[in-house]
């Protein structure tokens, strides 16, 4: 049987737009786990907090479920898919209204041994 060398964590329906989340994910893709956590700590962005939590969850999954060592882990895959959009309306002049889309994101982080 093949040795499992990667672990995954997901955060679903996060109230940050996918476009803004992808900007932060691009910073950590391919980095060592310790470096990625340091980058996220100093990124002043709402998405960075969510991604940091998801990354820590993926690390915990790797250590507890698959017995991998944190020192050997690398962020191998990260992606942000679009979640359900909350549609709202903003009242405007003369009784009209403008649509507002409050976008959500499904964040996925995969860590693997290098």
Curated annotation (Swiss-Prot):
GO terms for molecular function: rRNA binding; structural constituent of ribosome. GO terms for biological process: translation. This protein binds specifically to 23S rRNA; its binding is stimulated by other ribosomal proteins, e.g. L4, L17, and L20. It is important during the early stages of 50S assembly. It makes multiple contacts with different domains of the 23S rRNA in the assembled 50S subunit and ribosome. Disulfide bonds: none annotated. PANTHER family: CHLOROPLAST 50S RIBOSOMAL PROTEIN L22-RELATED, LARGE RIBOSOMAL SUBUNIT PROTEIN UL22M. Belongs to the universal ribosomal protein uL22 family. Part of the 50S ribosomal subunit. SUPFAM superfamilies: Ribosomal protein L22 (SSF54843). NCBIfam families: rplV_bact. Keywords: Ribonucleoprotein, Ribosomal protein, RNA-binding, rRNA-binding. GO terms for cellular component: cytosolic large ribosomal subunit. This is Large ribosomal subunit protein uL22. InterPro entries: Ribosomal_uL22, Ribosomal_uL22_bac/chlpt-type, Ribosomal_uL22_bac/org-type, Ribosomal_uL22_CS, Ribosomal_uL22_sf. PROSITE patterns: RIBOSOMAL_L22.
